[in-house]
Structure formats: structure tokens, C-alpha cells
Amino acid sequence: MTKICAFFTAIVTWLTIVFCPAEAVEPVFGETKAHIQTEFNEGEFVMGKYDLVVSPSGDDNNDGSLSSPLKTIGRAKELMKANGENAAATVWFREGTYVIDDVIEFNASDRKNVTYRSYPGEKVEFSGAREISGFTETTVNGVKAYVTDVEINGNEDYFRSLFKDGKSLSRSIYPKEGMLKIADPAQGEAIAGSHAPDFFTHSLAFYAHKSDIPDFANPKDVEVKVMHFWCDEHLPVYSVDKTTGRIETTIASAMRLRVDDNYIFENVKEALSLPGEWYLDRSEEKLYYVPEEGDTPENTVLYAGVNEKILNVINGEGINFQGIDFINTGWDYVDGKHTGIPFPETHPLYKNIKYGTAHPQAAFEVPAAINVEASKEINFTDCRFENISYTALKFDKAATDCDVTSCMFNNIGANAIFIHGDFVVPASTQRINIRDCHISFYGRIFNNAIGILLTHAYDCELMNNEIHDGWYTGVSVGWNWGYSDNSTNKIKICDNLIYNIGNGWLSDMGGIYTLGIQPETVIAGNIIYNVGCDESAYGYGG
């Protein structure tokens, strides 16, 4: 069944609920109140028999005591394993920023029943960014800018995320206001997808209105971002012909390009003008930045998201994270496997392709900065996930009995939380609970992302969360079209506050979006408002 059929099925269900209310029955829950935030008590420091202390000023040759702390989590993990005990233990992190150059890996060899947490009252950050300074003043496009040399090493250290004072800075975009419109989608050169050709055709070229194309100094640094249907396309430029308006890209679109589809250009040197904007020149290996009020070349320190992932837990058990801030990661284009490369090698544009086409729905193939897979009892409490450029936290296939409690997710590039399993009945991913979390400004890079996305999982609770300011759906549960058996069931979606989503960019969304038959699933006590779909003639559903 196609997505449109599912959409109308959802509409019928909604109308039935609104206009054909069932006879009053005893509620599943006695009283529901949307999002009453639970305060978390971080407790006091008590050094246990098997505990260790880590500090940015420590030394991995130390014994890990309070007066002689270690320096890295890697060394703490080694000592925990060497201990050979399974009694409860804690690794206490003293205040500071821990730059994660290599992904922190946990597996079956790591000791169980260990909590990695912040020292009470201290701020602990695990960061995926490196510091950039040493700016000098210059002029770009008639405005004052700062410039510094950066080592890119080809593509190895190229970055697309930049942070300052805890916030994400914007790459230079064109135009500054509104959107551009596709003049001609060149559908004659497109390749039809596997089904529903009105939606799924793939393009490596389109024609812009010629007057909309700036004189790009470095066209191959530029990205075309198309917003249409329920998908935003990230299409790096391969070539531009201003005489005809033709633009070719290195990724094929996931969905059909149409006349008047909205798009913008990102990472445009000629558009660099507003305070806080930046542009990375690949050929010169220089970073340009338009200063904000109070900046000087000497005091400006920026942080480039060069590492995309921070933590990976596979076959782990009994590992807890408490009071840790995961921050400032980078991103790259998704090399899609779901759609892959739809163009045959004989196609004249095949030579352009550098990445496979990603799944068009819900930022499904975007990786996670923190990943948990085939693991049990991996818990996050009172943690902060901020300025994460990919999906922040993913519980992947065969993750079970995991809790995320009283955590904050802010300025997330894709999905804030993604719970995913194999399409088997019963689902292998089970009992993942998200409670008392605050999710804000998700989908900042991959706009079709979800606040909480759940696909193919069983017996999970999504309860008492506040979710707002995303470009797409707040909570999505299902991932199975039609009326066949569904591995997603027994899900509680209760007492969530969901608002200010959509914001007029994409279509086919909802505060809560469900698919397929889901026995024992309960949706109750949620408050949803300010849901807005694409405002153009193409917009619907939201």
C-alpha cells in the first residue's frame, strides 16, 4: 500500500475518532497530565570500593583515586575490566571537556553494572569538536570577516558543523529570505523508482531560473537543499551552467522533483554576510567567519565538528550514563543503501554520483552519534545531547531493557531518539522507555527527522516528554504499511506535550504519526498544537 493510501487511512481514522466517539469506557489510566517534568536529584559523591575518578587534568598512570585521577574513559574502562568484579561501581568524571577523537566502544568484554557519571555539581562534556582560533581580519563581499587556515587533508578533515559559545553557527545560505523555485525538473532524464512513480523518481539534474543562480566561486562546495513532499534533499553540486540554468548534482534525489519545488543553496561564499555565518573554502583550506558583537580576531574561538560519533555500545550490558553532556559533533552526506544508486552505469550522468540515495522518510538512514545495539540495560539519566549533527541517540536491533530518563536534547541534526529493530514478530528490540525528556529544535540539518522515531519495537513507553520546534513529526511509531502482522505493538505514547512542529516546510506529518496494526498500543493524555505543513499549493497533512 502506498504512502498516500496510508495517509487517507489515517484521515479516516481521525475522522472516526472526532465525529464518531465511542461509548464512554473506563480510562486505561486514571488521570493523565501532559508533561509534568520530574526533577532529578544527582545525589552526593561517595567513593565506593571499586570506583574510579577521571579528570581532564589527570594522568592515565594514576590509580584513579580522588586525589590521583585518571585522564581518559578508555583507561577507566580497562581498569574496570581488570578488576574482574561485577559489584556496582562508578566512574566519576570531574568538570571539563573531554574531546573524543576516537569513538568510545563498549562490548561484551566490558564490566557490567558500571555507572559513568559526572561528579555532583560539575559540568562534564564529551565533545566531538576541535578548537579553531588564530583569526585575522579581512573583507568578504564588502563586510568585515575573520579568516584562519584550517587543515582539511582533502575530505578527511572537512567539516560541515561549527559551534561557538554552545550554539550552532549557520553556513552561508542563498537566498537570505524565502525560497527559490525549480524552473524545470528535467523529468525526462530521471529514473523511475521501484513503485509510485508520482512520488519516487530520482534526478541528478534540474533547471533553475537563471537569475536565481549566483556567480559561484566554488560551485562544488555548494549544496542544493530541496524541501518537498515529506523529504528534504541534500544534493551537493557537481556542475552549474548559468547560461541555461542547469544544475547537476552528485546525489540523486530520493523523490520526484517538480516545477516550483522549494530549494536553497548552502555553503555559498558569495552569500557570506550575516554575523555568525561561516564558509569553509576547500580549495584554499581557509575558514571565513562573519564576527558577532563582541568578537575580536584574538578572542574568537570556534569549534569544528570533525567527529561524527561519540559512543558505540554493541553486545554491552548493565552500563549507565548519568549527568554527561554529549555535544558538538559533525556530519557528512548519507551514503544511502535503501535506495542506493538508482542510475544504471550507462546513464550519461552516472559519472557524477558520489553517494547512494538515502531513504526519503524520517531521516531513517542518518547515523547516530550515540548508538546502542544488541545490548541490555544501557541507561541514560540526566544527560544532555546538544549540537549533535546526526541522530543523537539510537537503540538499534536487539537492544532491550534500556531507559532514557530526564534527558535534554537540543539542536539535533536529525532524530533526537530512534528506536529500531528487525521486522520480525515478536520484535527483537524491546522495552525501551523514554520518560521525562525535553526534546527541542530537532531536524536542524535533516529536516524530515522525528523527535522520537520508533520502528519495529515491542513493549516500549514514550511518556511525559516535551517535544517541540522540529520541521517534521513529533512522535512516529509503526513503519509497516497495511494490515499485515506488525512487529511494533504494545507501545504507550502518553502524557506528552508536542507543539510548534512543521513550520510550513514539509508535508504529511502529525504531532503523533502511527502506521500499521499495533495491538495493545495506547495513545492517551497527549497535548498537541501548532502543527503546520508546507504552505505552498503542494502542501498537505499537518
Question: Model-flagged regions — what are they?
Answer:
Residues 9-18:
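Bacterial N-terminal signal peptides
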Residues 116-117, 126, 260, 267, ...:
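Extracellular, surface-exposed repeat architectures
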